[in-house]
Structures are given as structure tokens and as C-alpha cells.
């Protein structure tokens, strides 16, 4: 079989049909859609059963006890038959030609991974475009597993880390350490719903500190493949830029203060001389300003700048 698409499902009855419609309508041939119900308490299973009955052999339904996104994806990978593996979140949807175009790009360029652009759709109608061609280093592209297609032989026995946030960063980055054969497609084939109640919007949760666990683990893998220099970028991008900013955007509280302090101390340990870091100096001026402010405990100024820029759009 050419392609396996893995779809973890939990509390998405409102969006699931749109997701599955976009998958069963793919123009690629010889593929399967593995739909893993991760113990969802809503009516998602009824929708899965309906699609499995309408598309026998194409939809592969699975049910498991709730264990989180990583465990659902890992189960899907364990049974996948495809030469290539793709992941789609069950509240998102994709262009009908996405996987056909990705497979063509991989085969044309003899690549192990293909990327495409993404669009995020927010509840207020805002649409944010993510252009993967804006970055020269693959590690700088969005860490989402969902706008990518992976060669199964590259994945090997790699899995998503159970029980942690930033599972995509862990999984994708480890694969990027193993190959530089990447095909890039400048089309927004992947469209995501950004819901107010989604996991990563929990700005005050201590799970934000999972980023430290993930980066420490990635550092071990980086050493195996001679990619130690990439760890600095991960700290810059995922702690000094996005991590601290996400927590700082929440309401003031003791928990928020402690989360930011822990992240900042970790960044300072990894980057004791920030402005001398080649990774830092290679960033754009805008990103360097925000990173510098957050490094020095001035995240309130960062928030003012970011909010002012957002209002001007």
C-alpha cells in the first residue's frame, strides 16, 4: 500500500465529518485512512461507523481507551500498511490533491519528507497563513506533523512521546535530524481549526514546561547525528519566542510568573551569551527583539509590541 493517513479522534463530532470528507475524496490511489477513537465520550464513534460502512476498505476504524493524542497516533502507526505516513487532526481538513502532490514531490526529488503550507482558521474569522518557503532551515518550519508526509522507512520505530505536550516537535525534529532530503510545496493544502478550548491554548498549565523535557530529550538525539548546533535554535524558537509569549499572554498569576521564570532560567542556562549565539544572530530583527526582551525578563514589553502589531493589521 502506498499511503496511510492516521486520524486521532477525541471530542470532535462538530468537525469530524468535514475532516473525513476531505480524506475520502483524495485524488491519490492505493491508500487507507486509519481513524483512531481515543475514548471520545461524544458522538464521534457514530460518525466513524457511518463512514466505515460507506467506505469499507478505505476507512480503518479503531477504538481505544483514552490515552491522549500521542498514544492514538502511535497505535495508528503500529497497524499502518503504507509506504508513506501522514497525520491529520480530526478537527482539520485538507485539499483533495494534498497527498497526490506530496507523493509526486517526494518521488520527483527522492525525498524522505514533504512539507506544504498551512492555514489556521480561528473562531473570530481570522485566517493565518504559514509559508514554509520562508525558512532556509527545515527546523524553522512549523513543527506540526500534519502538514507533512513521511517515508515509513525514515520513521522506523520512532513514536510520539506519551503524556507530553509538544509531541509534534519531538517526533518531527528527530526525523529531521536523520535526513536532509526534503521536498517543499508552496501551497496551503492543510487547513486547521484553532479552537478556544484546544490543548495548546491552556496558557497557565504547568504542561507548558514539557517543552524543557522535550528539548532535553532532543539534545540526546542531536548528539547522535551531529546536530548539537540545532538545540540553540529550538531554545530560541520554542522557549524565548513562542513558549514565554504564550504563557505571558494569559492573566497575571503566581503560576504564570513561575512558569515564565522556569523557562527563562532554562534558556539562560542553554544560552549564557545570547547575543553571541550564531543562531540568535541569524534570526530576523523582529524575532531577535522579542527573544532579547524575554531573555531579560521584559516579557510585558514583548506583549505590548505583539499586541500593538496585531491591532495594526
Which role does the model predict for each range below?
Residues 1-217:
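Nucleotide-sugar donor-binding/catalytic module of glycosyltransferases
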Residues 51, 55, 227-231, 295-298:
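Residue-level recognition of alpha-helix termini/interfacial anchor residues
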Residues 52, 103, 219, 264, ...:
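Residue-level detector of alpha-helical secondary structure
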Residues 253-313:
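Membrane-interface aromatic/basic loop that binds lipid-linked glycans or pyrophosphate carriers
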Residues 233-246:
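Amphipathic alpha-helical repeat scaffolds of TPR domains
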Residues 189-195, 202-229, 242, 249, ...:
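Catalytic core of nucleotide-sugar-dependent glycosyltransferases
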Residues 224-235, 280-288:
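Structural motif
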Amino acid at each position: 500500500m502506498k499511503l496511510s493517513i492516521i486520524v486521532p479522534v477525541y471530542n470532535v463530532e462538530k468537525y469530524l465529518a468535514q475532516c473525513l470528507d476531505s480524506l475520502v475524496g483524495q485524488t491519490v490511489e492505493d491508500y487507507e485512512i486509519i481513524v483512531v477513537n481515543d475514548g471520545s465520550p461524544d458522538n464521534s464513534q457514530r460518525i466513524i461507523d457511518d463512514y466505515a460502512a460507506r467506505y469499507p476498505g478505505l476507512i480503518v476504524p479503531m477504538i481505544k481507551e483514552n490515552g491522549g493524542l500521542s498514544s492514538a497516533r502511535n497505535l495508528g502507526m503500529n497497524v499502518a500498511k503504507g509506504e508513506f505516513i501522514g497525520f491529520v487532526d480530526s478537527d482539520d481538513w485538507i485539499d483533495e490533491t494534498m497527498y497526490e502532490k506530496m507523493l509526486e514531490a517526494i518521488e520527483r526529488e527522492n525525498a524522505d519528507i514533504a512539507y506544504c503550507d498551512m492555514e489556521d482558521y480561528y473562531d473570530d474569522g481570522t485566517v493565518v497563513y504559514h509559508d514554509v518557503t520562508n525558512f532556509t532551515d527545515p527546523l524553522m518550519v512549523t513543527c506540526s506533523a500534519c502538514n507533512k508526509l513521511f517515508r515509513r522507512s525514515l520513521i522506523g520505530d520512532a513514536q510520539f512521546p506519551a503524556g507530553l505536550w509538544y509531541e509534534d516537535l519531538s517526533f518531527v525534529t528527530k526525523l529531521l535530524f536523520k535526513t536532509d532530503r526534503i521536498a517543499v510545496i508552496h501551497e496551503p493544502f492543510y487547513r486547521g481549526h484553532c479552537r478556544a478550548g484546544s490543548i495548546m491554548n491552556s496558557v497557565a498549565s504547568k504542561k507548558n514546561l514539557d517543552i524543557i523535557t522535550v528539548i532535553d530529550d532532543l539534545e540526546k538525539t542531536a548528539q547522535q547525528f551531529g546536530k548539537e548546533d540545532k538545540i540553540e535554535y529550538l531554545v530560541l524558537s520554542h522557549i524565548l519566542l513562542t513558549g514565554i509569549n504564550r504563557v505571558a499572554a494569559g492573566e497575571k498569576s503566581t503560576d504564570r510568573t513561575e512558569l515564565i521564570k522556569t523557562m527563562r532560567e532554562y534558556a539562560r542556562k542553554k544560552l549564557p551569551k545570547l547575543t553571541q549565539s550564531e543562531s540568535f544572530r541569524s534570526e530576523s530583527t523582529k524575532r531577535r527583539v522579542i527573544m532579547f526582551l524575554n531573555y531579560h525578563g521584559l516579557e510585558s514589553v514583548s506583549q505590548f509590541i505583539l499586541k500593538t502589531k496585531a491591532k495594526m493589521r
